Amino acid sequence: ACATAGATFLLRTTAGPILQTIQHPLVAISALSALAFFLPSLFAGVPAPVLAVAAIRGRAQSEQALGAMYAAGAVGAIAGTLLAGFLFVPWFGSVATLLTIAATYSVAAFICSWLGRASKTEFLSTSLGLAAVLLLSAGAANMQPVCDRESSYYCIRTVTLSESQTPPIRLMVLDHLAHGISGRDTPRVMFTDHTAMLDALPRMRMRRDEFTSFHIGGGSYSVPRAWADRGISGITVAEIDPEVTSKAEEDFWFEPDMATVVHRDARVALWESEARYDVIIGDAFTDIAVPEHLVTLEFFGLVSERLAPGGVFAMNLIDNTGSLDALAAVAATLREIFPSVEVWTEARPPEPNERRVFVLLAGAEDSPVSAIETKAPGEKRFQALDTGYVDEIIEKTDALVLTDDHAPLSHLMGFNPVID
């Protein structure tokens, strides 16, 4: 109970410094998890073997007692996982969940002390330990939370980037990732490379201001807001987390009448939709967390079915320039469905082992131009990689075609830099 209550302190005091100090997100998340949860997990596992030995000692049919212990452990693990994922974390947050577990341990400690007829000294030591739990819990509950809002999916934060005297510019942070930046007075200006390309490239392909679009992922809603400001209508956004949309409305100047928002998994929403769209945009991908069901051969086939004639599919992707395994796999998979697949990125040589932002354009035909200039937020040039170079990457990496049965894209994107 003390270790679990103490984990709340560790989470709130060390999460910020660890995530800011350790650059690679996988290493940072692993370090934070080990620091906060190693001791609670260790102590939670101690009673089970002790109780198992006590349960079978002196019994003629010890296998029944041992089986009951294992069954109780399995039921508890399943129930705990379900309650944490679908009840406690979504409704109360991670800190309140840990405090609830600490309280449960405390009640169990009192019951065990009573059933075991603890001596006064033992009961006093138990009471002192539980007093420590109470103090730790009260202190943790009063500490400044790391998240502005903790949903079922993300720790959501808003960071103001502009000075107080200038029009506000804000950054949305989902977990550790800077997901989107928006300016109140400049809705058409994109502040990141991936939103700049997702904004400009489909408009370049459409060659008109009136077209329909389906957006996979909302985030700060930078692109839907920019297109609505340009008078583009027929915008549909599939954002799985309602709290993200609420935060976009609250802090990022997104208005509900700018787009039709569907709070569902994007693949399900697209499958259920009977509409055909001129543009489909995939913006649900981060640097280490990838919804694998949105990068498979089967999903890209669904995208192709939902595209109107002459339509285009654009999706962002982050990969390490030292390997480009993930980029090659997605490009190879898209080529199985679409006649034309282009890979766009900033028009500059890559840095060694740089985690580079790419946007893949897929459709029935190639783009009319091989380079564009747009604001991100200053003028920046983006260009399509030569087709021969993309062929070489796919051949060199022996690119895997991703399917619903096997799509290890998170491994290709996130683990290679750590292992290497």
Question: Where in the sequence are the language-model features?
Answer:
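Hydrophobic alpha-helical membrane-association signature
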Residues: H194, V295, F299, V330, ...
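SAM/dcSAM-binding transferase cores
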Residues: F358-D420
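Class I SAM-dependent methyltransferase Rossmann-like catalytic core
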Residues: I181-L201
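Short secondary-structure transition/capping motifs
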Residues: P40, P187-F191, I216
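Short alpha-helical "patches" and their helix-cap loops
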Residues: E210-G218, I372-P377
